[in-house]
Design a protein with these regions (language model features):
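Negatively charged
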Residues: 1-457
Length: 457
């Protein structure tokens, strides 16, 4: 019996199928397409593929996708020299513990999008035999606007080791979400990565909470435009060396180091951010959000002239004592909600270079924090350049800034402010300088315990 050349979806959605054994009389030597052959065979526990001849197969995309009860798939004798796509091949094989791909020839493969995504029981995988000179895709694109793209090893939550030392990424465009949520992965050898064509490394190590060091010295980032959430929730990382990064084409760094709660220092003085528009995002968090152990941060080279979003950029950086933002120019800034909230060790902050003329809201409703709320060590704050004519929301703006003795708000216009709850909550009596009687009336309405002084022009 000869299987048809196009054997795509041959057993797709056979949800009651538990056992498959191919006899020697089932001839697959002429088969070109095995796409989705066992797709969503959700009850399949035993699959004998030893007699299959796959030497002419070109397409193996989604071949075993969704076979959630298979614990092992033996394809160790397969000849895959003609295969061009392994797209989603083992995706969603959530019971798969071992996988032998030692015979695979991947020299003609162009697409490995999400090949192993969702293999949540897989502990180790050796792909050292994989040669990928033609590899273009390792990401599966989203099917609709609200779903994310899916990366090569995404949600391989038990994966501790992976050997991809012979991969060639020289033609690959995106490494987005490559190791997303590989939370047990303790080390990755990236020394052989050729990333000269890569434009997207967003969320590449997102949720890799066991990675202690990440060596990116070989990374060529000259074409990269998206670095958002690259190291998000890398909670064990104590050293991330990005000193050789070329960031001249990057447009978003939102959440890049967010939740890297073990980082103590970060030198980004080499970063060229002239094209960056987003250092934060309202959906998620800011670039350094919750870097709670960060004591030293060098952003002296940052060009922020094109930035429009700094949402929660430094929020929860509780160990940061100094922050030099004197180079920050912000003519296009529209979002800075809770930008410095909970920077409880920060002693001084000079924002005299900031242009806030396009800002309307300064607080974050989801976390009930304000722009400077809980900056309890702050003794000096320069907001003399603030243009607040369009601001309507100043909720908890200076709440619990308990070390401030005086505050010059003489540039502030409160005429459009409608939300101001807990504006000065928790502050001891101190002097606030305002420009006119209307401003003084506003402060007295907000907190009658504050000593408000009209500053003469």
């Amino acid at each position: 019996m000869y299987a048809p050349e196009n054997s795509a979806n041959l057993f797709k959605n056979f949800t009651s199928l538990t056992n498959v054994t191919f006899s020697k009389y089932f001839n697959t030597s002429n088969v070109i397409n095995m796409q989705g052959m066992f797709y969503d065979c959700t009850s399949l526990t035993n699959l004998d593929l030893t007699s299959l001849d796959v030497k002419n197969v070109v397409n193996m995309s989604s071949m075993f996708r969704g076979c959630s009860k298979l614990t092992t798939i033996d394809v160790g004798n397969w000849n895959t020299k003609n295969v061009t796509t392994f797209h989603d091949m083992f995706r969603g094989n959530s019971s798969l513990k071992t996988l032998n791909l030692s015979s695979f020839d991947t020299t003609n493969v162009t697409d490995m999008g999400a090949m192993f995504a969702g293999c949540s029981k897989l502990e180790t995988i050796d792909l050292s035999n994989f040669k990928t000179p033609n590899l273009i895709k390792i990401v599966t694109p989203k099917y609709n606007d609200w779903d994310p793209n899916v990366g090569l090893f995404e949600n391989c939550t038990s994966l501790e080791q992976v050997n991809i030392s012979n991969f060639d990424f020289s033609k690959t465009i995106s490494l987005e979400r490559m190791f997303y949520n590989c939370k047990l992965l303790s080390s990755i050898d990236l020394s052989t990565f050729n990333t000269e064509s890569v434009t997207n490394i967003a969320s590449m190590f997102y949720g890799c909470s066991k990675l202690a060091t990440i060596d990116l010295k070989k990374f060529n980032t000259s074409k990269v435009t998206d670095m958002s959430f690259m190291f998000y929730n890398c909670t064990s990382a104590s050293n991330i060396d990005t000193s050789l990064f070329d960031t001249s084409n990057v447009t978003t760094m939102a959440g890049m180091f967010a939740n890297c709660s073990n980082l103590k220092s970060l030198d980004l003085s080499n970063f060229n951010t002239k094209n960056v528009k987003a250092f934060g995002t309202i959906t998620w968090r800011g670039m350094f959000y919750n870097c709670s152990k960060l004591e030293e941060l060098n952003v002296s080279s940052f060009d922020t002239s094109n930035a429009n979003n700094m949402y929660m950029m430094f929020a929860n950086c509780r160990s940061l004592k100094k922050l030099d933002l004197s180079n920050f120019k912000t003519p296009n800034l529209t979002s800075m909600e809770s930008m410095f909230a909970n920077c409880s060790s920060l002693e001084s902050l000079d924002l005299s270079s900031f242009d806030t003329s396009k800002i309307t809201i300064t607080s974050d409703d989801s976390s009930t924090t304000g722009l400077f709320s809980d900056c309890s060590s702050l003794t000096s704050l320069n907001v003399s350049s603030f243009n607040t004519e369009k601001m309507t929301d100043m909720k908890r703006m200076f709440a619990n800034c308990s070390s401030l003795k005086s505050l010059d708000l003489s540039s502030f216009d409160f005429s459009n402010v409608t939300r101001y709850i807990e504006f000065f909550k928790g502050n001891v009596s101190f002097n606030v300088y305002v420009k006119d009687q209307a401003s003084k009336d506003f402060i007295n309405k907000v907190d009658s315990g504050i000593n408000c002084v009209i500053k003469e022009a």
